Amino acid sequence: MLTAFTRAFKTPDLRRKLLFTLAIVLIFRMGSHVPVPGVSYTAVQNCIKNADSTTGVLGLANLFSGGALLQLSIFALGIMPYITASIIVQLLTVVIPRFEALKKEGQQGQTKMTQYTRYLTIGLAILQSSTLITFAQNPSALFGPSCTSILPNDSIPTLVIMVLTMTAGTGVVMWLGELITDKGIGNGMSLLIFTSIASTFPGSLWAIQQQDGRWDIFIGVILLGFLIIALVVFVEQSQRRIPVQYAKRQVGRQMYGGTSTYIPLKVNMAGVIPVIFASSLLALPSLLAQFNRSTTGDQAGWVTWIEQHLVRGDHPIYMITYIALILFFTFFYVSITFNPTEVADNMKRYGGFIPGIRAGRPTAEYLDYVLTRITVPGAIYLGLISLIPLIALVLVGANQNFPFGGTSILIIVGVGLETVKQIESQLQQRHYEGFLR
């Protein structure tokens, strides 16, 4: 592997891409520590130091921003508005015929869809930054009751400048991600999420060691993390390959077809999206409870019930609800991203068939049958990966947004594998051996 890294940096154009990617990542991480105008940096740091563990409402977003959210930096929103916009646009392709038509138009349609995603990202950034500033006016909702004030001046012009700065920061982050995709290595947006999550690892691990002062627990957590990573790598690489044969056909004097290939159906077809959906949906009751919390101490019954059962991840009701949502969203997302009927029609159009299965409707039914059978273990796997770290780390006083949680590991492994494969293909094009042998 070290030889492969050396060869990658010895190849001029590949070295240029790698250094460009590292430079953009460095700019992104630097921007994550620059506070927006109107925020007291000293007060924010003191509040973070004495903060309660952030769970539910803002924990996931703070994790994806590499801690920039709670620091109220210019990149506080990170890549979350873009992720949300991409998911919404992808879901709308099923509902709106215009979007479905654009999806089938190839590169031109994809460019138009990307443009819509950018517009929606800016709209969501305005909404999310306004919400964050509202929380910042009452910082106890962000950092706990020990924090009372982080905005020396909360006049309307100052708040507007803060919202515009965070929205502009989201636009810059989106541009940086696209620069990496165009001129660097890997998918830019994915790499920015990767670096955001990875940047929280050292601090979170050290916090566990400092909390108990026991090195055996610290080493145990690290070993558990490596074990989970190994399991995720194994499952993410697992796939069911359905053989496809193409019939020979003659065009003029040329003979085409007669080749064989396969349709790869991954065990985890949905990726990390169901976990994000489930985490976001499960955060809504906690958000409602926070806004309806009584200042006199006499809480409504439903607010007390939510705070007892749906805020901390160590409660059985929270865990059961969480895994049920993950199972539902896994089947839902796979059903809208992989259409067996469309795949069968495309195969029939180009003369392809699955050996032993008739073309057309029987092929679609067979693909649907295989997809359902492979999605069941995939959904269970997502649920277990999300719950096992939760159960284990609650025992050492961590919260469900700890970096070794299911969401973090799935993203880090997925992005890492994708980036390594891209570097691998670049090396093999130049007749070098890559990382994967």
Predicted regions and their residues:
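N-terminal cationic and glycine-rich segments that engage phosphates or anionic surfaces
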Residues: 1-103, 107-437
